[in-house]
């Protein structure tokens, strides 16, 4: 499993200097940085699927599937974001909600800040991570998965948690051309009209890259309708971001 390698990378010894370290193992290609504070940044590609992970975080109480982190995706201010907890990690390893966007941010930035909110009797913790100027190993992993090294659409991505839910889910149909992998996902951002119908949608991230699922998902989204979680009227022109997934199982 790709998450198993990321968990292993997060547990390895600290690297002697600040570089992206390349790893190749059984068809998986990865790049990682390990910091003396115990945090690890990792990007990995396997079978066309690209993931970006943070490792070495304080463990969580309970068994939640997601973890909220404040990150400097729009430096210098921190913004709230929700990450998926890697299996068997107790929250110490989390997967980015938009791996391509985060990877591109790290290759073009000088630093990355992470704040882990307080939980139970543990205080909030903040990490200020300097990034290497040489990102050749990271670029190689992104290229192996067909991830673009630059994308102007990254500028409009908002990682903050949603305040809307589907009142009427989109009419989902199987993609006309199935992705080469058995799993595909698309990150889409839309504005809404006064009735809560999505409009002016943009594909922000797609995994596997260039699988065609993103274009298919873009066509499905406008068939749904959203409403605010608190029951207040939807603000016309408001913007929301959603993730749509597709998976195939063998019978």
Which residues make up each language-model segment?
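Charge-biased low-complexity segments
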Residues: 13-251
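Sec-dependent N-terminal signal peptides
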Residues: 1-11
């Amino acid at each position: 499993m790709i998450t198993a390698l990321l968990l292993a990378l997060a547990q390895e010894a600290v690297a002697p200097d600040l570089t992206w370290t390349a790893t190749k193992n059984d068809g998986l290609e990865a790049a990682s940085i390990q910091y003396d504070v115990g945090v690890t940044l990792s990007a990995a590609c396997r079978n066309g699927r690209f993931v970006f992970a943070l490792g070495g975080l304080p463990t969580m109480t309970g068994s939640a599937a997601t973890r909220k982190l404040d990150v400097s995706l729009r430096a210098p201010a921190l913004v709230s974001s929700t990450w998926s907890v890697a299996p068997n990690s107790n929250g110490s390893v989390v997967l980015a909600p938009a791996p391509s966007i985060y990877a591109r941010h790290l290759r073009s930035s000088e630093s990355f800040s992470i704040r882990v909110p307080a939980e139970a009797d543990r205080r909030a913790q903040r990490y200020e991570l300097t990034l290497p100027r040489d990102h050749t190993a990271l670029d190689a992993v992104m290229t192996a998965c067909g991830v673009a090294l630059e994308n102007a659409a990254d500028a409009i991505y908002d990682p903050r948690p949603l305040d809307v839910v589907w009142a009427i889910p989109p009419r989902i149909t199987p993609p006309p051309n199935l992705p080469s992998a058995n799993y595909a996902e698309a990150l889409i951002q839309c504005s809404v009209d006064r009735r809560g119908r999505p409009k002016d949608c943009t594909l922000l991230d797609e995994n596997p890259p260039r699988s065609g699922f993103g274009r298919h998902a873009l066509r499905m989204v406008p068939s749904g309708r959203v409403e605010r979680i608190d029951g207040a009227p939807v603000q016309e022109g408001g913007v929301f971001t959603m993730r749509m997934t597709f998976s195939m199982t063998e019978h």
